Amino acid sequence: TAATSDIVIVAVPWEGHAELLASLRTELAGKIVVDCVNPLGFDKQGAYALKPEEGSAAQQAAALLPDSRVTAAFHHLSAVLLLDQAVDEVDIDVLVLGEERAATDAVQALANRVPGMRGVFAGRLRNAHQVESLVANLISVNRRYKAHAGLRVTDI
């Protein structure tokens, strides 16, 4: 549970993001919070990015959880691959954003525990909107190519 964990991952639909975080403010105080939420809309043309008033879901989390160490990560992972028992390795880089080095280092280390996965520091929370928004493009790629595409950062 959130109260007993050092690192808490938030992976909920955008529509319930703010309400959930506000209700857990006390339980999440002092914890590293990893926001994985992608503010997306969907219509007949497909997925598209929404722009939260705070700038991103992660920035909204930081505003709602002033006593937590908010990071943003794990946005581009395929739930299908993560749940597939036959998959031994997830070939993906996890972009990790945050304000505090120790918190982003901890989240990178968490990503590195999954075979094939690599945590990569990708900047501060003010850049989380771009990372969250890219999921709309990945959804289009995955639909077109019947894939579970992710990202790799090269030359690091």
Regions found by a protein language model. Give the residues of each.
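Short beta->alpha connector loops
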Residues: 13-16, 76-78, 100-102
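Active-site phosphate/pyrophosphate- and oxyanion-stabilizing loops and adjacent acidic/basic residues
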Residues: 22, 59, 109
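Conserved catalytic-site region of short-chain dehydrogenase/reductase
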Residues: 42, 77-81
